[in-house]
Amino acid sequence: MNIEKVIAREVLDSRGNPTVEAEVFLDSGFSGRAIVPSGASTGTHEALELRDGDGRYGGKGVLRAVQNVNEVLAPALVGLDASEQGAVDAAMLALDGTPNKGRLGGNAILAVSLATARAAANELGVPLYRYLGGSNAKTLPVPMMNVINGGAHADNNVDFQEFMVMPVGAPTFREALRYGAETFHALKKVLAGRGYNTNVGDEGGFAPDLKSNEEALEVLLEAIEKAGYEPGKDIAIALDPATTELYRDGQYHLESEGRSLSTAEMVDFWADWVSRYPIVSIEDGLAEDDWDGWRLLTERLGDRVQLVGDDLFVTNPERLARGIETGVGNAILVKVNQIGTLTESMDAIELAKRSRYGTIISHRSGESEDAFIADLAVATNAGQIKTGSASRSDRIAKYNQLLRIEDGLGDRAVYLGRRALR
């Protein structure tokens, strides 16, 4: 199962921006392909996404990253065993030699890392989730469906980035997807009835100019009920306010409401919402380096809701270990391009599970038809996945792959529902 050839090319993501696609060819004739995603709101501590910075594509071209694959990584990987994922990833990390993959680019390294796993699975003739997770890979994730977009994901006056529905009361993944899709369509009617536009944002959710951040919760509850479900029982609410984007000079600025909050006031804000709405998960409720604030938030709400670190942990085992040691958060969002290799991503998931932290596999706002994360969610029995709304084919590709996996597992498939939450 030795690597014979590696090639990369520049392709486009769901926002029309360039990204890296890699193909790994084995001496057996089998191959694997992968496209890396790209984020809009990115954590400071993420692996470097190498962009060209020239006149092409407004500076967002990735020809340098492609060149690094074709001229630096490819020659070094020829002859390595594709089934030794750790060794392949370690070789690429050694070639890069920087803590943030800043020399070759996290996007270059990740594309090859994921394509290698696909090639190995293809040669063995097993589904990717089974190759990565073995015979115990059988848990379908509860979807976090981002149906209202704001913040950096939409051009509107909603401060918080994502308002999501979680079908925690569904019996199977297939039914969970139906619950979410029906709520999405009901929400469109609710918004139209209030005179709001029903255009969608980067992740397929609606992006209306609401009167306030809280109105997003109100229309969401109305949509859940109009779809025939009970808020909190059948469908709960999850939030990603992406507060790092709102944090300046020690204050959280809610521009749509014309006010700024201290860390303690932001914690009070979340406690109030949790007490009045069926919110079960808050991601990045405070800024990425507000560690003292995160401790306060965890002490206040950690036994009531899932507190997810995205920008806080950036899928980095070292930052996650710090969070575990200091009692910060209780769940991690896993984005493979934040850390830049499959091995490091799975290390972070394993550390989280050992420490009884929740795990959510996540897309980015700039996606593609590649559905790798669907297989990764099942492979690791993560229990939760965040991959957009019931709209846009780049999001639906992941849901459809999960439907295929559920069918393939048959009676062995497990859907945890509310039990998946930390």
Swiss-Prot record:
Q: Which residues bind (2R)-2-phosphoglycerate?
A: 161, 335, 364-365, 386
Tell me which residues this entry annotates as catalytic. Answer: 203, 335
* First-level EC class: lyase
Identify which cofactors the protein needs according to its UniProt entry: Mg(2+)
Enzyme Commission number(s): 4.2.1.11
Keywords, ordered alphabetically: Cytoplasm, Glycolysis, Lyase, Magnesium, Metal-binding, Secreted
A GO CC term assigned to this protein in UniProt:
cell surface
Q: What function does this protein fulfil?
A: Catalyzes the reversible conversion of 2-phosphoglycerate (2-PG) into phosphoenolpyruvate (PEP). It is essential for the degradation of carbohydrates via glycolysis.
Write down the PANTHER family for this protein, in alphabetical order.
ENOLASE
Q: What is this protein called?
A: Enolase
